[in-house]
């Protein structure tokens, strides 16, 4: 659980997945907390841009083919992070993206802050936690009846270093959490 919202969970996920000074493939439309992690860990971002939906004037999803191309061109990338669903509700093909990312032996981190509700109806898209992502971050307060700042970091595979994540969650969260939020 995170009582410092998805921000602390994103900081911890990135910090635990990429060595200081390392490279990470990052969707350009990611949350500012990811940029804070890049700065704090002195990471080298490789930006991948979502396609633009001209008709709606919003960012679309990220294609698995584009992910494959970027990973082939950047073999020293240590993780891939994308946002799905986006702030506009666009969902990328997480299952196929996870297969691509895992062929390159790196973890897939999905910022699913706006998708905590996905588990609760067959009419919603499937959560990244069920589609092969290694780390999934959800903000309960964005789409569920929960207090502001409540979020979770799901560890979905052995590619996520649990001990590192625990250590960084301890660094990035308050040492005096509100029991009301927990």
Where does each model-flagged region fall?
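Conserved PLP-enzyme active-site core in the AAT-like
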Residues: 4-182
